[in-house]
C-alpha cells in the first residue's frame, strides 16, 4: 500500500545520511563497517519494511545483532527513520532503495536472516518477476546469506504463500517451518513472533497468517 507523501519524511531522510542510505548507487560499495558500531555481529535484513514496526521492535529486542531495513517508499522510510532517531536504535541502519539491487549493496555471505513480511503479492501473471519470492530474488538472497543463514516469510495472502512454497521448492530450498495459521500455532516460533502493522490488523480480523522458514542447501 502506497502511503500519502509526507514532505517532512523526505527532509528527514536527506538530513540523516549517517542513518539511512537514500537511493544508493548499486555500483558503489557500501562501507557497512563504518555504519555499524560492530559489523561482526549477526546481521538480519528486512526487505519491504513498511512503517517499520517489525524491524524497530526486533532491533530493540536484540542489541546483540545488527539490522538493516530496506524500504522503497520515501515516506515509509522516513517514518522508520523517525522512530530510529527518537528511540536511539543504534543497531539499525536503513536503506531507501530497490530490493532488486540487494546483492550489490551487501557483501556475499554476510547476512544471517532475510525477512519478507507481507510483501506485495503482485497477483497478475505478467508481474510475477516482481514478487519477492520469484527465482531471481532467491538468487540474490542466496548470494548475501551465510551458508547457515535462512529466509523467514509471512503473509496473509494465500495465493502468494502457495506461489512462494512452489517457487522455493523448485529452487531447491529446504523448509524448516511451515504454518497455515501462525497465530494459532503453539510453538516457539509464535512465542518469538514480532508482528508487523499489517499482521496485527489482519490477525485481528480473524485472517490466518501464513508463515514459512527455509534455507538454501
From Swiss-Prot:
Organism field: Lactobacillus gasseri (strain ATCC 33323 / DSM 20243 / BCRC 14619 / CIP 102991 / JCM 1131 / KCTC 3163 / NCIMB 11718 / NCTC 13722 / AM63)
PANTHER family per UniProt: 3-DEOXY-D-MANNO-OCTULOSONIC-ACID TRANSFERASE/TRNA GUANINE-N 7 - -METHYLTRANSFERASE, PENTACOTRIPEPTIDE-REPEAT REGION OF PRORP DOMAIN-CONTAINING PROTEIN
Keyword vocabulary terms for this entry: Methyltransferase, S-adenosyl-L-methionine, Transferase, tRNA processing
UniProt-listed Gene3D superfamilies: Vaccinia Virus protein VP39
Binding site for substrate: 124, 156, 196-199
Region annotated Interaction with RNA, chain positions: 126-131
Domain of life of the native organism: Bacteria
Residues involved in S-adenosyl-L-methionine binding: 46, 71, 98, 120
EC number: 2.1.1.33
InterPro entries: SAM-dependent_MTases_sf, tRNA_(Gua-N-7)_MeTrfase_Trmb, tRNA_methyltr_TrmB_bact
Pathway named in the protein's UniProt entry: tRNA modification; N(7)-methylguanine-tRNA biosynthesis
Active site residues per record: 120
Entry's family note: Belongs to the class I-like SAM-binding methyltransferase superfamily. TrmB family.
Lineage, highest ranks first: Bacteria, Bacillati, Bacillota, Bacilli, Lactobacillales
Catalysed conversion reaction: guanosine(46) in tRNA + S-adenosyl-L-methionine = N(7)-methylguanosine(46) in tRNA + S-adenosyl-L-homocysteine
Keyword DNA-binding: no
Name listed for the protein in its UniProt record: tRNA (guanine-N(7)-)-methyltransferase
A GO term from the CC aspect: tRNA methyltransferase complex
Its biological purpose: Catalyzes the formation of N(7)-methylguanine at position 46 (m7G46) in tRNA.
GO molecular function, one term: tRNA (guanine(46)-N7)-methyltransferase activity
Catalytic class of the enzyme: transferase
Amino acid at each position: 500500500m502506497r502511503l500519502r507523501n509526507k514532505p517532512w519524511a523526505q527532509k528527514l531522510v536527506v538530513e540523516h545520511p549517517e542513518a539511512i542510505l537514500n537511493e544508493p548507487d548499486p555500483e558503489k560499495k557500501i562501507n557497512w563497517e563504518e555504519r555499524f558500531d560492530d559489523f561482526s555481529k549477526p546481521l538480519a535484513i528486512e526487505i519491504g519494511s513498511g512503517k517499520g514496526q517489525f524491524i524497530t521492535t526486533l532491533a530493540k529486542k536484540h542489541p546483540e545483532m545488527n539490522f538493516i531495513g530496506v524500504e522503497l517508499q520515501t515516506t515509509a522510510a522516513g517514518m522508520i527513520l523517525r522512530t530510529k532517531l527518537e528511540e536511539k536504535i543504534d543497531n539499525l541502519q536503513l536503506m531507501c532503495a530497490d530490493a532488486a539491487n540487494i546483492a550489490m549493496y551487501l557483501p556475499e555471505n554476510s547476512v544471517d536472516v532475510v525477512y519478507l513480511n507481507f510483501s506485495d503479492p503482485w497477483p497478475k501473471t505478467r508481474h510475477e518477476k516482481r514478487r519477492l519470492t520469484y527465482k531471481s530474488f532467491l538468487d540474490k538472497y542466496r548470494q548475501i546469506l551465510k551458508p547457515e543463514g535462512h529466509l523467514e516469510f509471512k503473509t496473509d495472502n494465500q495465493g502468494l504463500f502457495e506461489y512462494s512454497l512452489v517457487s522455493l521448492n523448485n529452487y531447491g530450498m529446504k523448509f524448516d517451518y511451515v504454518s497455515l495459521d501462525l497465530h494459532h500455532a503453539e510453538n516457539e516460533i509464535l512465542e518469538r513472533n514480532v508482528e508487523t502493522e499489517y499482521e496485527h490488523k489482519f490477525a485481528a480480523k480473524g485472517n490466518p497468517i501464513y508463515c514459512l522458514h527455509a534455507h538454501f542447501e
